[in-house]
């Protein structure tokens, strides 16, 4: 069944009534932008003359940023350092209206930063990412910080409609935190979704999972490239992970959605006029899918809205966001073009 504009508007309007707690690995995304003017004499690499420099929330912070831009009330819970980048991240989130009381400072653990360098020649209208440098600490989290985070979660989880876990495998969403969080959410009847970059089995039993194709393939141990492989593999993964809903993102091929009520379908990607950057697109999809489900959408409806959102943000540079108005406008535009 096609998603109508009226139904989409009903779902999107309900976003503003939802409260979501995002738990996971917080990072700062740093972007340096310039023109590639020549090849260096020191090595066969381009020389970039910088013309722009910006910072954006990354990782779980970007997921929260997206959810806030969609109109929902959102808080973050995770670890940062006791440094300038932590202050910058707090300021960005605070200015967007994201609640940051759950950010725990661990002085011995610098705030994670991911630096991307973008270059475009004088005649180029789009920039290309030419380098990425990750400054990420994956050391085990201290027991003191773990307990402080768990204590915060015990007080916060009952106050929210749902919890969305954003796991970049940087150490925050480790076993002690999961062993406290999942039963806590279950006791209070809270929705739990997870967007994990690996080891999907650690999130067995959650309401919704949103892996990309390589992550799903790694969990299953086989390819999902052919349509029959995708549909069979997705259904198997749904059963193995004992979750109610599974959304597998497929990059330029779109996505596939499965649920325990028999839904199993591939959704083609929306047309995109020039991909600027895929950074954070998975966060947008996870946020929109989760909010749509919390707003009463079916799995297929939630996936269709998430598909629209993903097509919007990949046309923007950096870990971008979208809004309900922008999503609805894109749906109407696509419907008009199809007539």
What label would you give each PLM region?
Residues 5, 17-20, 28-164, 323-339:
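Conserved N-terminal subdomain of the carbohydrate kinase-like
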Residues 1-14, 183:
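Short coil-to-helix leader/linker segments, especially the first N-terminal amphipathic alpha-helix
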Residues 26, 168, 284:
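Active-site metal-binding loops of divalent metal-dependent hydrolases
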Residues 22, 76-78, 194, 248:
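Structural beta-sheet core signal
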Residues 38-43, 206-214, 253-282, 328-331, ...:
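Flexible glycine/proline-rich, aromatic-decorated loop/lid segments
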Residues 162, 170-264:
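Conserved phosphate/ATP/ADP-binding segment of small-molecule kinases
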Residues 240-244, 270-333:
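Conserved post-catalytic alpha-helical subdomain immediately downstream of the catalytic base
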